[in-house]
Design a protein with these regions (language model features):
Chain B
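N-terminal lobe/hinge region of extracytoplasmic solute-binding protein
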Residues: 38-87, 118, 190-192
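Structural transition elements
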Residues: 195, 321-355, 374-382
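Gly/Pro-rich hinge or "lid" segments in bacterial periplasmic/extracellular proteins
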Residues: 73, 164-220, 224, 346, ...
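Detector for C-terminal structural segments
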Residues: 43, 201-205, 210, 278-281, ...
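Extracellular/periplasmic solute-recognition and catalytic clefts
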Residues: 120, 137-140, 198-209, 226-289, ...
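A bilobed periplasmic-binding-protein/Venus flytrap-type ligand-binding module shared by bacterial periplasmic
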Residues: 70-71, 209-213, 275-300, 304, ...
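Surface-exposed binding/hinge segments that line
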Residues: 95, 129-175, 199
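Aromatic- and charge-enriched surface segment that lines or borders ligand/interaction sites
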Residues: 81-126, 141, 147-149, 236-239, ...
């Protein structure tokens, strides 16, 4: 409990620093949201532009803008998005669900299948099965997700017509109940596959290496000498210890998936945080972008905390202090 | 005595309505269905009286109607039924359609027009605030007659030409007494159009449904329209092919896909319906650079550009060579009697030698820093072609890649460029569009304006005179002169005139049947599914 509290207090300055750093970094980019807006509109006169800038508070010096923003953030007020003409908090909550759903399905798919394949390959090192799995891993690893997305789209949507091209649900389909769940699931098949395959190959390769390493250690030999069956050996002695580096990677990658989903979300037009972040940069939508970064830093801090807890659970030698 | 322009237009419009009706009969209209339209970019707001932008009209045009629209037969009455001007051009009287209701059931009256004109068109709407700068007041002599009073003469044909884009009344009862820019109806518009706004899911879609109470009886045919936001052009092409999307306008798919789908008999691919939305691909000069300030150099550079080649390879043939600031779609204001610059690289080299810029030891005459606008694929390709063509005549061009805000600031505010390229849309009348490229005196930071350091008192005078000339014939002549002068002096090269391109499923019927179709109301669009 005290441990959790300490971690929480430590997280505050980290997040504040991230926010200030990002704010200043974004201000270094040429142009602001009014420029982007005017670019979208195909032009405007000088008065229109000056009025909008005053309206958005962009005519103030940067440090005044930063101070105002941090004050508002302290009360968890994310401000107003001038691109979406909605409060940032509303937009973020709208988008968070889709992203978390996509992340959860992709990572759990990648993780379970990845460690299973990795363990199988490791147990049969240099056999035909190992070669097949390793090659597959290499192919997944080398295929860029945008290419994979488009190829899947071409095959399953355009040629075969099995799966929808994009979106999160059938618009004007007005499905409810289980039909709705099924509809969303159908829309998530390709994005999940596109996003998870590369991570699957990470876990696969790491798990394979880790299992091979652990399988040679003394305590495994001891367990085998004591008469533990192969299955028990694998689950209790090898897997549990081999998982540690994989968990580390999982924790690290949780944040990467947020970024990696930009491409997949854009191609499949999933209304998630990745797509929103990308749009916000292009549109110089400071408030939304800062909101996303705040949310992401919180997610990363929480995930790191959970990873540490999981470590202690898997390896009782690790103490939380 | 009042100038009457409308009677011919009315006759034409009614004939058109009859012909259209008979065509429709012949094809046996199917009612109902949902048309799905591809949009590349998210819209910030959907209020066309606050944002003059085709992206906004593409959606709001079905929900909010303008006073006057444009058809292939001329200007078509929508919420206005008749318009006329006083002799001195200081008062324009507009008769309004009776028996029209807003989507919330309130009647549409002159109060709405007067409120919107003063509070939005004059104060807040881009392009319009310049056009309506001399608008003093709008009087409602009765609930269906609006009189626009100007302090300077306003040519009636300019007023009418501006209305399809810049003449959308909004409901006064929902805006009065509120902060107009933050009004919730800006993203959930209430209009008088054939479709009613239902919802806008950010990043996904906008949904509108049939207005059962629409004033054109028996219309619309469709039950629903869905606009889907698909940022990725390849994914949009896949959606078209999979039949999930029926139309993608404004070159919403890659040029390679435009070419590929034009051979696919499931789609109509072409530039019909964009006559009012033509744009110029440009080469813009920074005249602060002494080399580029020399008109001979600019003319030589024009001779170095193979425009026909660029049209074939980049625009896939869907374009024509530019002839100055007024495009061929500009009607009477256009002329092709202007100086032109044939592709002749040898001549270009000779001219550059003569201008005093021989090839130096570096292998080039001089070096230019070029900023390409990030407005889509073909703009980038045009920049690359330009750089290549210039190298052939001995000018080294370095391309500085930037995103939209970077480009706009680099060129139009900081003037940190030698040459730039982008495109600029023509909006029915030169006075409300392309003249800003030539008129000097606009403060730094005004995008799409003369920020090139080019200044000509003669040109400024010609532009101002033409904007307030009441006689349409004289006005057209003035624009011919401006066009010729712009082609001679080349402050900007209006290199390629191109409409936009649509890919449309053949299941859609009556599509692209007006010169600004993507912005129009689609009341007669139907789906053969």
């Amino acid at each position: 409990m005290i441990y959790a509290l300490r971690r929480l207090i430590q997280a505050v300055p980290v997040i504040v620093l991230i926010m200030i750093g990002t704010f200043l970094l974004l201000k270094l980019a040429p142009g602001d949201t009014v420029d982007a807006l005017v670019g979208d509109m195909g032009g405007a006169d000088a008065e229109f532009i000056a009025r909008l800038r005053a309206e958005y508070g962009l005519d103030q010096p940067v440090w005044v803008q930063l101070w105002r923003y941090m004050l508002k953030l302290a009360t968890f007020d994310f401000g107003w998005s001038f691109v979406y003409e909605q409060p940032v908090a509303t937009i973020l909550l709208d988008r968070l669900g889709t992203t978390l759903l996509l992340m959860a399905t992709s990572l759990s798919f990648a993780f379970t299948i990845g460690i299973a394949l990795g363990a199988i390959a490791a147990r049969r090192v240099n056999s035909a099965t190992d070669n097949l799995i390793s090659t597959l891993g290499l192919v997944f690893y080398a295929t860029p997700s945008f290419f994979l997305s488009l190829m899947m789209m071409l095959l399953f949507s355009v040629k075969l017509g099995w799966l929808p091209v994009g979106g999160i649900k059938t618009i004007a389909g007005f499905y409810t109940g289980w039909d709705h769940v099924l509809d969303v699931a159908r829309h998530l098949v390709m994005p999940t596959a596109a996003l998870s395959l590369i991570y699957l190959s990470f876990y696969l390769r790491l798990m394979r290496a880790s299992v091979i390493e652990v399988a040679d250690l003394d305590y495994v030999r001891t367990a085998r000498a004591k008469g533990a069956g192969e299955w028990r050996l694998m689950i209790h002695h090898i897997m549990r210890n081999a998982l540690l580096p994989v968990i580390t990677l999982l924790g690290l990658q949780f944040s990467t998936v947020l970024g990696g989903s930009v491409v997949v979300e854009t191609i499949f037009t999933l209304p998630g945080l990745g797509q929103l972040a990308y749009q916000s940069v292009v549109q110089r939508d400071m408030n939304t972008l800062m909101g996303i970064i705040f949310l992401c830093s919180i997610i990363v801090v929480v995930v790191n905390f959970l990873t540490d807890l999981l470590y202690a659970r898997l390896d009782s030698r690790i103490e939380l202090a | 005595m009042k100038l009457k322009l409308r009677s011919l237009g009315l006759a034409l419009a009614s004939t058109a309505a009859v012909t259209m009706a008979s065509q429709v009969m012949a094809e046996e209209v199917k009612r109902g269905g949902t048309a799905v339209v591809h949009m590349i970019s998210e819209q910030r707001i959907l209020n066309p009286a606050l944002r003059a932008s085709t992206g906004v009209y593409n959606i709001s045009g079905k929900i909010v109607e303008p006073l006057i629209d444009k058809s292939y037969d001329g200007y078509e009455p929508v919420l206005a039924t008749d318009w006329s001007s006083s002799d001195d051009g200081l008062a324009i009287t507009v008769k309004l359609r009776e028996g029209v209701n807003w989507h919330d059931g309130e009647p549409f009256t002159c109060d709405d027009v007067a409120f919107t004109a003063i509070e939005m068109w004059k104060k807040l709407l881009n392009y319009s605030s310049a056009l309506q700068a001399s608008l003093e007041s709008v009087d409602c002599t009765d609930p269906h007659t609006a009189v626009f009073n100007y302090s300077k003469p306003m040519p009636l044909d300019l007023f009418v030409a501006a209305m399809p884009d810049l003449g959308h009344p909004m409901p006064k009862h929902l805006y009065e007494g509120t902060d107009i820019l933050k009004n919730e109806y800006n993203t959930a518009p209430v209009g008088t159009g054939p479709f009613k706004f239902v919802e806008y899911e950010r990043g996904q879609y906008v949904l509108a449904v049939k207005n059962e109470d629409y004033w054109r009886e028996g219309y619309p045919y469709l039950d629903r329209i869905v606009w889907r936001f698909i940022k990725d052009k390849s994914a949009a092409a896949a959606a078209l092919e999979a039949g999930e999307v029926h139309e993608s306008g404004f070159i919403g798919v890659s040029m390679a896909d435009v070419e590929r789908l034009s051979d696919d008999d499931r789609f109509d691919v072409g530039t019909d319906g964009y006559e009012n939305n033509v744009a110029h691909s440009t080469v813009e000069f920074n005249h602060r650079n002494p080399i580029l300030a020399d008109v001979k150099v600019r003319q030589a550079m024009y001779h170095g550009l193979d425009i026909d080649y660029a049209i074939e390879t980049i625009m896939r043939g869907f374009a024509k060579p530019g002839r100055g600031p007024v495009p061929s779609a500009g009607g009477a204001n256009y002329t092709d009697d202007v100086p032109t610059y044939e592709y002749d690289p040898e001549l270009a080299k000779t001219m550059l030698d003569e201008a005093g810029y021989p090839v130096t030891d570096s292998g080039y005459r001089f070096k230019l820093r070029h900023r390409p606008a990030p407005w889509g694929e073909y703009t980038q390709l045009w920049a690359e072609y330009y750089a290549q063509a210039m190298r052939e005549i001995g000018i080294d061009v370095e391309i500085l890649t930037n995103d939209a805000p970077g480009f706009l600031n680099g060129v139009y505010r900081d003037h940190d460029f030698d040459t730039a390229n982008g495109w600029h849309q023509f909006r029915s009348d030169p006075a409300v569009s392309t003249m800003v490229w030539l008129r000097s005196g606009q403060p730094a930071g005004t995008p799409w304006s003369n920020q090139f350091g080019w200044q000509s008192d003669e040109m400024d005078q010609m532009i101002d005179d033409a904007a307030s000339e009441l006689d349409p014939e004289k006005r057209a002549e003035m624009y011919h002169e401006i066009q010729a002068k712009a082609m001679e002096e080349l402050p900007v090269i209006f290199a390629i005139e191109h409409p936009f391109i649509s890919v449309t499923s053949k299941k859609l019927k009556n599509h692209h049947n007006t010169p600004r179709w993507n912005s129009s109301s689609w009341y007669d669009l139907w789906l053969d599914d």
